[in-house]
Amino acid sequence: MKTPEYLAPLREELAAALKQADNAWSFDIFKHTPKLESFTKECLRVFTPSGKKPLQLRSTGRTLSPGTKFSLPAQQAHLDPDNYPNPNIFDGYRFCDPQSGACDIRGTITPSAKWLIFGIGTSACPARLLATRISQTLFFKVLRKYDLRLKLDNGQPEVVYAATNMFVNFNTQMYVKSASI
């Protein structure tokens, strides 16, 4: 994990949320995880998945030739200093309200010109809430069971690109051990 300083606070938040839910996993658990909400949105902002897909746009009266590639400038919007202060610095609590500590799921799943992670307009992903909650649940399950640390020589994982997609080098190694919760 590139930002291990978030592991302990997120684990604590998970433990408290589970306690409030009598240790039962449910959708309601996310009402008590504002740090996770902000952390998720910051991960999506900084590590924007992007790609290019062939498409014909008949609904707009325009037709792109089959095989024409296009993409939204999501990463450019997410790293624009006019949209986000200090955009190149990962801040897992960027989207938490400084006074209340709250972070609303609507900020993560509502498309806008500044937030393009799930597309925008009529083409926005209809399963964005489900995708977000599944990702968060999987993250919490791993976080609850394991301590993770990247095995790095220089402190930063190598990034590789395939077309317009960015990935951590698949040969990057991790140390994994059972968590002590």
From Swiss-Prot:
Observed phenotype of the null mutant: Abolishes the production of ditryptophenaline but leads to the accumulation of cyclo-N-methylphenylalanyltryptophenyl.
Cofactor(s), names only, from the UniProt record: heme
GO biological process: secondary metabolic process
Keywords: Heme, Iron, Metal-binding, Monooxygenase, Oxidoreductase
InterPro entries reported in the protein's UniProt record: Cyt_P450 (IPR001128), Cyt_P450_E_grp-IV (IPR002403), Cyt_P450_sf (IPR036396)
Keyword Heme: yes
GO MF annotations in UniProt: heme binding; iron ion binding; monooxygenase activity; oxidoreductase activity, acting on paired donors, with incorporation or reduction of molecular oxygen
Enzyme Commission (EC) number: 1.-.-.-
UniProt-annotated binding residues for heme: C125
Statement: the UniProt record of this protein carries the keyword Oxidoreductase: yes
Root EC class: oxidoreductase
Pathway this chain belongs to: Alkaloid biosynthesis; Secondary metabolite biosynthesis
Assigned protein family: Belongs to the cytochrome P450 family.
Function in brief: Cytochrome P450 monooxygenase; part of the gene cluster that mediates the biosynthesis of the dimeric diketopiperazine alkaloid ditryptophenaline. The nonribosomal peptide synthase dtpA accepts L-tryptophan and L-phenylalanine as its substrates and forms the phenylalanyl-tryptophanyl cyclic dipeptide product cyclophenylalanyltryptophenyl. The N-methyltransferase dtpB is responsible for the N-methylation of cyclophenylalanyltryptophenyl to yield cyclo-N-methylphenylalanyltryptophenyl.
Name recorded for this polypeptide: Cytochrome P450 monooxygenase dtpC
Organism classification: Eukaryota, Fungi, Dikarya, Ascomycota, Pezizomycotina
